[in-house]
Amino acid sequence: MTRAALLLALMLTGPLGAGELWLTGATVMDGSGSAPVAGLSIRISEGRIAEIRREAAPKPTGEGVVHLGGAYLLPGLVDAHAHIETPAAARRALLSGVTTARVLGDSYLKALGTRDLVRAGHAEGPELLVSAGHVRPRLGEPFLLSFPQFGRYLDQPLEGADQVAEVVRAVLARGADVIKVGASERAGLAGTDPRRPELSYEEMRAAVAEATKAGKFVAAHAHARAGANAAVRAGVRSIEHGTYLDDETLRLMKERGTFFVPTLAIMSPLGDPRGDSAEAIALQVRTHHMQKPLRAVVKKAKALGIVIAASTDGSYGDGDDTARVRVAHDVEELVACGFTPLEAITAATRDGARVLGVESRTGTVAVGLEADLLVVDRNPLLDTTALFEPMLVITDGRIVLDRIER
């Protein structure tokens, strides 16, 4: 929404209704890339943004009013690539300001169960869109224990479009919101080579066809040039990681409207010898040397106008190197790659929602959208570290974190 459109949306209102919440004195960054607008009030009703108005209008009073005193109000953050698997991790993500997350990969369907607990109101967390697995030639023990009908792949690889389509149908039937395919090998294991392709064009095309029938998108784990190029031609929604993308693939992504989720922030902890991965020397060295080419790719993608979304690739859990990564770290990484702070915040809000296909519901501050909101105490355009310190987090109109001084 443009600045002009935001101001046009300002309206007067009546008395405070039951179950309503007012946020007054807000400096609103609406997530669209427009400059902040000071002196606004937001009315929330039935979990949605019902009204945005000028502070000059009669101020509401009552228990359902939070006076922000000029603090900065943004859309809740979108983590476009996470590995949230437990209710505790989901709660940590939410309290960090993440109100929507796409979980790509799932061990023993734990993320799927956590998603269902959150949706049923039994656990606190962001809205989770879950892949319920990783479709690749070697499906792995966690996948096969969750889908024992594919036990024949315990000792042999998945191969061919028909086999891939069968697996994708099963994952969708289990309730997946998105399909994750392996276009290249993993980077996070010392014994794999992220430059080596995995699924073929025909296999990924079959995955896209099955997902499309179900109204779902496909995300491609892709570090390698060849694998990423095949994934884009196959019609995936997004390329994840993209460390070694070449110019041809980037141009193709721009032409096809393929989104890019580079997961920049995860590189630092995985390459940090002080972390839990310190014993895997090969992994440390690899991760450290992947940072430079990935940053170069991100700069090229930005210059081409490819839509880039922020993410963590993290677990928000306990006991692993990825747990401490936050979306705010990725905002800092994007700024280091030439984004303005406003562009980086847009990548963490509206553009993340676009990647997930939920931009009609969340990702911006606009009348009619879900009240997924984040408040910080200082201007994040001048100091992006403000995003590490949320003062207020609201999801679906409910306050889940409140550090506002009264």
Named regions from a protein language model:
Residues 4-15:
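Bacterial N-terminal signal peptides
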Residues 19-21, 28, 32-74:
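Histidine-rich, glycine-flanked metal-binding segment
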Residues 67-74, 90-216, 249-251, 256-269, ...:
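Divalent-metal coordination cores built from histidine and acidic residues
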Residues 104, 183-295, 309, 314-318, ...:
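Active-site core of metal-dependent hydrolases
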Residues 213, 292-379:
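His/Asp/Glu-enriched, well-ordered alpha-helical/loop segment
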Residues 348-350, 367-406:
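C-terminal cap of metal-dependent C-N hydrolases
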